[in-house]
Amino acid sequence: MFEINPIKNRLQDVSERTNILRGYLDYDAKKERLEEVNAELEQPDVWNEPERAQALGKERASLEAVVETIDLLDQGVEDVDGLLELAVEEEDQETFDEIEPELAELEAKLAKLEFRRMFSGDHDASDCYIDLQSGSGGTEAQDWTSMMLRMYLRWAEAKGFKVEVIEVSEGEVAGLKGATVRIAGEYAYGWLRTETGVHRLVRKSPFDSSGRRHTSFASAFIYPEIDDNIQIDINPSDLRIDVYRASGAGGQHVNTTESAVRITHVPTNIVVQCQNDRSQHKNKDQAMKQLRAKLFEYELQKQNAEKQANEDAKSDIGWGSQIRSYVLDDSRIKDLRTGIENRNTQAVLDGDLDKFIEASLKSGL
């Protein structure tokens, strides 16, 4: 005899949780909006306004992720229930054995959709920037900053996000003094926002001939890209704009023209840089976009005293504001906020960050 009750209980659980999500994620409204967006994208003149068309395409992908997944879950429950009936009726072990992998796949899809509930912040759906800055530790810290850049790039690419390196500042001997990256994709800021903070590395330094253990620090600061419709008032007299020759991953034109741009907002001392284009004008536009986003985040922090003052934390990158410790000799990476550990240090440095990120989001950080 087949053990059908556990299967029936799991099917009922999937069905009930799907119905909860249907209401929570406003399935009916999203399905109606998806039809409207599809109709608009089918219009022959839609690409007369490229920015509008791109925004619609992004909205469609977001809507489909909810609507199509719920449709698949509904259909999947029906299909598995049908398989169960057939297996029992025909007393067919082979058919019964097909149920477990199909049901497990449904449960995985459901868990992934449920995780979207973590992205409830006002700007979680936005693209974002990652600012990395080396701290205490000299060359070792600068090498650690370059390792962190690689780690986040690997993570983002594995997630299917679009990655753009906006600016890098080379270290004096090796590594990076700092870097800025733009991450574009669904819930990019939602995924990364809890990564803001100081990351501590402990290892035997390749830059120390004695092979001693060194401790070094680098910070990550994550902030959302803001919609052009949001009004951010910037007084031109508050800005100091410097141009310089690009000095890193900027292509063949590096060090040949002063195309790189650095903008300092004097009242807040916020600095943004861009060197990823040949055109000084384009680099200035991108830097201003970053500045608007940083000022927006800065104002949010001022209004919400409970929110960690990330920009202040950047000024003292050391022991005080760590979020994660990477102890390579002991094969141990530990998140100091959630207690989550991973002993596969190479996998983490290769971008396997989901375990840490998901735990921090679930804990409400």
UniProtKB/Swiss-Prot annotation:
GO terms for molecular function: translation release factor activity, codon specific. Methylated by PrmC. Methylation increases the termination efficiency of RF2. Peptide chain release factor 2 directs the termination of translation in response to the peptide chain termination codons UGA and UAA. This is Peptide chain release factor 2. HAMAP family: Rel_fac_2. Belongs to the prokaryotic/mitochondrial release factor family. The modification N5-methylglutamine is found at Q252. Its main location: cytoplasm. Keywords: Cytoplasm, Methylation, Protein biosynthesis. It comes from the Bacteria. One of its GO terms (cellular component) is cytoplasm. The gene is prfB. Pfam families: PCRF, RF-1. It is found in: Cytoplasm. It comes from Aliivibrio fischeri (strain ATCC 700601 / ES114).
